[in-house]
Amino acid sequence: PYLAASSVEQRNKALLLVAENLRANAAKIFEENKRDLAAAEEDHIAQAVKKRLKFDEGKLRDVIKGIEQLVALPDPLGKVTLKRQLDEGLVLNRVSCPIGVIGVIFEARPDALVQISSLCIKSGNCAILKGGRETTYTNRILFQIIHDSIIDAGLPADCMLQAEQHSEIDELLSCHETVDLLIPRGSNSFVQYIMNHTKIPVMGHADGICHIYVDRDYDPNKAI
């Protein structure tokens, strides 16, 4: 409730502190990321996955830029998105508000942790974050920086939590009385597993479908 009722100035302050502290701790972040990359090499992780889990100067610059852009956006809370007079003296308003507690489960992308955390802070939502084991060290230091920034901004410490153990996924799936929404990011089979093993509403996805339509009068070799 405190986070949902916080001012946009306080939430923006937290975001700016996150950006500032990410810059200040860049060397430590890169060092922890090297540990994840070394472990991935030992475990013979696929090259595509290793590319995603790498967190370098470019990705740090991108996430900080994203945070600054988020700060520049207006407050998403308390906006009247629909107003309708139902009867004399009776007006129905639809007002934007936080969802509540969002559980986000994602795979080997440490930059996703920063992006998700930032979006939750701006929108006044509490978050429970579970990243892939491939990015354990990077996620740990990134979360610590974000968590410390939240506290320094005066927001409650428990508005952002991190789950590290794989066993905690099933525990999270059972929290239908306290978690309002789950967002799994990963393979189709992973998303289907989440959807099939929880009573919590899931914002999931299936396999992407891409189509190309070519007019019969056009040369396919030019169109494709």
Task: Label the model's feature ranges.
Residues H147-Q162:
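A glycine-rich helix N-cap at a beta->alpha junction
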Residues L172-L181, S187-V191, N196, P220:
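Active-site/ligand-binding-proximal alpha/beta "capping" segment
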Residues K79, L129-K130, L161-E164, I183-G186, ...:
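General beta-strand structural signal in soluble alpha/beta enzymes
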Residues K83-A127, G132-L142:
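Substrate-binding/gating loop at the entrance of the active-site cleft, primarily
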Residues P1-V91:
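N-terminal Rossmann-like NAD(P)+-binding subdomain of aldehyde/semialdehyde dehydrogenases
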Residues D56, I64, D87, V91-R94, ...:
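A structured beta-alpha segment of the ubiquitous adenosine-cofactor-binding alpha/beta core
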Residues A108-D111, Q115-C126, I141, I145, ...:
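ALDH superfamily catalytic-core signature
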